[in-house]
């Protein structure tokens, strides 16, 4: 059951659209980010020797996925999305975002590298 939840969480993360490049870090190793994005961008400027070691299990998400743990073996797992079939009858309009809907979908994944290369 936990493996199924992990795969569903990974599939949902893969379905999110890529973020727009709104920030270009300044050249040079001594640049420090300030403001809203400083926490997000701080890892770009760290040297490998100063990085914290990874924890054995990383808690992911809030809401229904808040108890989901991703172990290091699952985080490095290569998977590809074979097919996504949205259930249009389950779509609900998001109140805080204009023109955005949240829908349930059937997501078909593959853990085999050969399946990922054939698409």
From Swiss-Prot:
Signal sequence segment: 1-21
GO molecular function: G protein-coupled receptor binding
A single BP term in Gene Ontology: neuropeptide signaling pathway
Record-level GO cellular component terms: extracellular space
One Pfam entry name: NPBW
Location of the protein in the cell: Secreted
Propeptide: 53-119
UniProt keyword Secreted, yes or no: yes
Highest taxon above the source species: Eukaryota
Keyword Calcium included in the entry's annotation: no
Family designation: Belongs to the neuropeptide B/W family.
Free-text function comment from the UniProt entry: Has an effect in food intake, on locomotor activity and has an analgesic effect, (in vivo pharmacological studies). May be involved in the regulation of neuroendocrine system, memory and learning.
Name recorded for this polypeptide: Neuropeptide B
Organism encoding this protein: Mus musculus (Mouse)
């Amino acid at each position: 059951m936990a493996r199924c939840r992990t795969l569903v969480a990974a599939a949902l993360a893969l379905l999110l659209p890529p973020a727009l490049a709104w920030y270009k870090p300044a050249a040079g190793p001594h640049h420090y980010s300030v403001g809203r994005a400083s926490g997000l961008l701080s890892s770009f400027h760290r040297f490998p020797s100063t990085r914290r070691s990874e924890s054995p299990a990383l808690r992911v998400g809030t809401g229904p996925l808040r108890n989901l743990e991703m172990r290091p073996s699952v985080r490095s797992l290569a998977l590809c999305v074979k097919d996504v079939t949205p259930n249009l009858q389950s779509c609900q309009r998001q109140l805080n975002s204009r023109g955005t809907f949240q829908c349930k979908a059937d997501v078909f994944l593959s853990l085999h590298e050969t399946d990922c290369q054939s698409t």
